[in-house]
Amino acid sequence: MPHQILVTVRAPLKPGRGPETAHLLEALRKTVEHDGGPLAQLPGVHFARVFVLPGDDELDITDSLVYLSEIDAPQRPHLRALAADGELGALFAQCVGYPDGGSRRAAARWVRQHQVRVATRYVHTVGRGVDQVRDEARLRAEIETFLDDPAHLPVGGSPAEVHEAIRRFVAGRPDLAWALRPAAGPGLAFRARELLHAVAWPALLLPLAPVLLPAAVLGLLAIRRRESRDVPETERPTSAHVATITRGEDHGTVNPFTAYGQVKVGLLRRTTIVVALRGLDYAARHWYSRDNLAGVRSIHFARWVLLDGGRRVIFASDYDGSQESYMDDFIDRIAWGVNLVFSNGRGYPPTRWLIKDGARYEELYKRYLRRHQLPSVWFAACGDLSARNLDDNAVLRAGLAGELTDEEARTWLALL
C-alpha cells in the first residue's frame, strides 16, 4: 500500500488580487460542498484545503495563497493534476509568477517550485490508502447487510460458526474476496528510508550529547527568564471571525483546523521551535505512526509548516468531533506537547519552563486558537468516517484472514 505525503504549496498573491481571490474561493467552496469539485478529482486525496494566508506588515510579508493536501504516494501525478485543473488554475493565476496561458508543464513546474517543506507531520496510520479506506467501509456495509438476514446464519451457531459463515460469504463475492488477504504495508523503499531516519538521528546526536545537553539547559534557563516578560493575547475573537470559521465546521464527522501565528522574535525562540518540531516529527514518524498521537486517537493528519525564514508557522489538522472536544483532548492529554511548540508563538498563554501552564489556561488557550484560525475551502474524501471507524474497519478485515476461536470471534463480531 502507498505511504502518505503531506503536500504544501504556497505563493504570494499579486498586488490587488485579494477580492478576486476571495470570489474564486467562494465559487470553489460551493462546488466542493456540492460534489467535491476539482479537489475530489485529484489523485490519492484523503483531505485537501485552499486558503489565503494573511500578510504581515510588521514583517513586510504580503498575502499568499496556500494549498494543503494529504495524499497517497506517488506525489507527481497529484501535482500534475493540480496544475492542470482549470478552476484551481484560476486561483493560482492570482499569484506572482504563475505562467498565465502557459503549458501544463510550465504550470506543474510552477507548482513544484512553490512547494514548502513540512517541518512536522502526523499520519494516523501510515500505509492506509484512501482506496483501502473506501473498500473497507464497503466491506463493513456488505457484511452488515448479509447479517440482516437471519437465514444466512447457522441456527444457534457459535460465534466461531457465525464468523465462518461471514468468511464464506466474503469468499463467494469476487468483489469482496480481496478482504481475505491482509492489507499490505508501505513499500520497501519507504520502510528502508524510515528505518534509516530512525537510526541516523540518535546516532548523530548521541556523540554530541556532552555539548547539546548543557546548551539545552542554558537555553531553557534563558527561555524561563523571557517567559516572565511575555505578554499573552487576552482579546476574544470577534463574532464575525467565529462565524466565518464555524461556517466550515460540523458538516460531517471530520473537521478541519487551520491556524497560523508569528514566532516570538529572537534567535532563541526560532531555534527552540525548530528543535521542538524536529523532535515531534521524529516521535510522530517512529513512535506514533499507528492509531494515536500521544493518546489522542481523533486526529487523521496534522502538520506544522515553518514559513518566512522561520518567522511564522502554520498548523493544520483533520480531526473528529467538535472543536471544543478537540481542544479539550490536547489540554487533558498532551498540554506539554502543545506548549512545547505553541509557546514560541506571540500572544500564547503564559508558560513556565516551556512546557508548563500555557494550554492549562483553558479560556485563554481556546481564545488564542480561535483568533489565529483561518477559514479554508476544505475537502474530505471520507468525511463521515472517524479515525476510530477506520481502525475498526481495518480490524474487521484483518479478522477475515483465518479461522477464529469462539472468544476471538465474539470480540470480532462486537465490531459489527
What does each model-identified segment do?
Residues 69-89, 317-339:
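Hydrophobic, ordered structural segments
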Residues 33-36, 91-94, 283-287, 328-331, ...:
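Glycine-rich loops and low-complexity Gly/Arg-rich segments
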Residues 50, 302-306:
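Short edge beta-strands and adjacent turn/loop segments
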Residues 1-46, 55-64, 70-77, 107-296, ...:
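Short S/T/G/P-rich N-terminal loop/turn motif that feeds into the first structured element of a domain
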Residues 88-103, 336-352:
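Conserved short beta-strand edge segments in small beta-sheet-based binding/regulatory domains
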